[in-house]
Amino acid sequence: FYFMEMNTRIQVEHPVTEWVTGVDLVKEQIRIASGQKLTYTQEDIKLTGHAIECRINAENPEKGFRPSPGTITDMYLPGGKGIRIDSAIYSGYTIPPYYDSMVAKLIVWAKNRQEAIRKMQSALGEVIIEGIDTNVDYQYGIVNHPDYIEGNIDIEFIERL
């Protein structure tokens, strides 16, 4: 058989998979690239808990998600048990207009979906990024929406917000 298309890079969402499986995907990818074998089999992988990822973008949801380049004047990103931030931004960093607008990934893990939602609600509520527009408040609204909390989501959920 043949591959019509193949994406050989790690996906943005890989921290979710890593947290619920306990597998360091980047480490395994490097091992494979260097000719080594995987350190586990499919049967070794057990799913544990629930993880949620929010991509924090420099964009304005109220203006059609228009990109928001500029300089970050102040910021605070949450931390703690079950919270992961993947980012390279800092206060004084300038977001250029030329690239993808994602400036951070906020990932949470908990024992179950309800706890993970509560953790994400809290974490998003703590995020401070000033000087640029972000989609943090928009995502906060999503994870606090009753339909999201109850899992009553379909392809028209975002349009109903």
Set out the residue ranges of the language-model regions.
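ATP-dependent carboxylate activation and anion-phosphoryl transfer catalytic cores
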Residues: 1-161
